[in-house]
Amino acid sequence: VRYAIVSDVHGNLEALQAAFALVEPTDGLLCLGDIVGYGPNPNECVELIRARATATVLGNHDVAAIDNFGLAYFNPTAREAMRWTQTVLTPQNADWLNSLGYEFRVPEFLLVHGAPVTYFEYILD
């Protein structure tokens, strides 16, 4: 079984489309979250992931876009980007993000955005 994995798109539609153009056919596409944030195309990115991903988990930017979670922990630029994203995200896309979980388990692996215990913990070298 072969999967393609995408993460931290942050609303960058051009980068997402370029990544998809490079991906060989696989058994599924897995998205590790942060579909929105920073970039100018949050709705288009959500819609493309919705259409193509086999499984998707929430990232911290996705959560912030739908319920203000943790905005105080974002740097000022990220906070401003998330507030803008909140104003342009369609209700349908917000509802879809809200339907996602923080983890996705299959027998072979566990998908999370950050770390298995605390989903939004940054992984540092």
Q: Language-model segments: which ranges?
A:
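Core catalytic region of metal-dependent phosphoesterases/phosphodiesterases
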Residues: 2-96
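Acidic, His/Gly-enriched loop-helix segments that form or flank divalent-metal centers
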Residues: 76-125
